[in-house]
Amino acid sequence: RGEPGIVFELKTADRKRDLNARVDEAFAQIRDRGYYEGMEGRVILVGMAFWKKVPCVRIGSA
């Protein structure tokens, strides 16, 4: 079993109000491109977007 796998996708936003849309795009990219395929066991998916130093994070599982 071991530790879970973790997949990150990072995006930047030009405006603070775009953070939620960009984090959704990051998360969708992980799923659409199947970055977690072939990983065994539990896989944690992390979409992150940044505007300057302000983060927005979405976490899910495969």
Positions of the model-derived regions?
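Conserved catalytic cores of phosphodiester-cleaving nucleases, focusing on short active-site segments
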Residues: 4-16, 33
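Nucleic-acid nuclease catalytic cores
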Residues: 23-24, 34-59
